[in-house]
Amino acid sequence: PATPAEREVEGRASREEVVDWWQERFGVAPETFENVTFWEKGSGKIWAFNADLPSPVRVEGLGITVLRTRQEHWKPTTTGVKRFGREATTNVIELEPAEAAAFAAGHDQQLDRWDGDWGYLIAAHELAGEREPIGVGLYLHGELRSRVPKGYQEELAVLK
């Protein structure tokens, strides 16, 4: 549904709520999602697709998963962060090369320097002079916990 008032299924996130969440949590401008349609498939699994296709066919999967909403704290997905995280202006932790390599490999690490919000963050590193999102981290009590799924974990070269 476009807005909460148009909701047909109790608890289902509206387009407005999804866009607002990305703006409030990560500072991603609403215009970023201008041509993006959102679908909920499964319990709170939000999919994004860069078009709007009218179809009589029941949708089973379309686009990429970007958010999980049927829990106390909404959680961005790795694919969502990789797609929209470059536009983020808040709650992005920039990792040094060795930290980025450990994070991408799925390792948790102590990082006491973060002074922003606790909770889900976008972990990023510098690649070719640009900030590149690696994935989702959960920051609690001075520890950055990698939430990179096993299928996305990789070994990054540590460049100086």
Model-derived regions: residue spans:
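Polybasic, low-complexity RNA-engagement segments
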Residues: 1-160
